[in-house]
Amino acid sequence: MPIAYANLELLQRDDFADAAQWHHEGAGEIKLLPEGGLRLHCFGSRQGAEGCMAFFRPTLPDHIAIEYDIIVHSHGGLVINYLAIRGLQGEDLIADLAKLPPRTGIMADYYANRTGLQSYHISFSRFDDDGRHTGTSNWRRNPGCRLIGHGSDPCKELKRRYSLRLVKDAGHCQLFVDGNFAHGFIDWDHARPIPDTGKFGFRLIGSDVMADVFALRVYRVPPNMSVWHICEE
């Protein structure tokens, strides 16, 4: 069931006049588009191997909505967004690279216990290396890559411009596409602290997957404690 969160305050924006706010690691390339956008391209790889990683440099707080537009140009892989990715001891994903285990851009670098990172991530436009759709769009929690939510993939079409809105309110996350609720989750596992603050990022992974990102906005939204009570009824 979708729960409405109003945008209270604009915290960050990027219209991609330059790429100064983005950190690239792994494979592939990122480059600016003349009309104002960021192109991410992973090629010559395979799922699980080195991906095209792009992380937004500002550290984002909890209780936020992230909005952007995306056009996927090829179906030889999938797109992942990371929310609140940081070290388990509070390390900054980018500034504290030297304090964290080295990363080459393989998938396990961002979920394995050995790398000491926590986050939520969501996959969409979810095709395999040969261009076959894999069935769903998944939410996972890291470390551990634990499945905590899933639903129908709302971004299957090539060359179509989609408007995405990701809402994070502590352990409650939602995905909206073109103004419509797609799916979300509530994370009831408090065995360790839930992912809270950190970086937002992209992972493109596959044999050939390219996407253009436009008009990134990050808003503060109000915490909603009633979510937990509604779901207990």
Predicted regions mapped to residue ranges:
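Flexible glycan-contacting loops in extracellular carbohydrate-active proteins
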Residues: 186-214
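Exposed low-complexity, polar/acidic, P/S/T/G-rich flexible segments that act as propeptides
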Residues: 210-224
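Short, aromatic/His-centered strand-loop micro-motif at the edge of beta-sheets
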Residues: 137-163
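Secretory/extracellular carbohydrate-interaction modules
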Residues: 45-138
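Low-complexity, Ser/Thr/Pro/Gly-rich disordered linker/stalk regions
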Residues: 1-82, 99, 154-156, 172, ...
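Short tryptophan-centered beta-strand motifs in secreted/extracellular beta-sheet-rich domains
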Residues: 68, 160-169, 173-177
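A generic beta-sheet turn/junction motif
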Residues: 74, 168-170, 206
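Short strand-turn-strand beta-turns centered on an Asx-Gly dipeptide
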Residues: 176-184
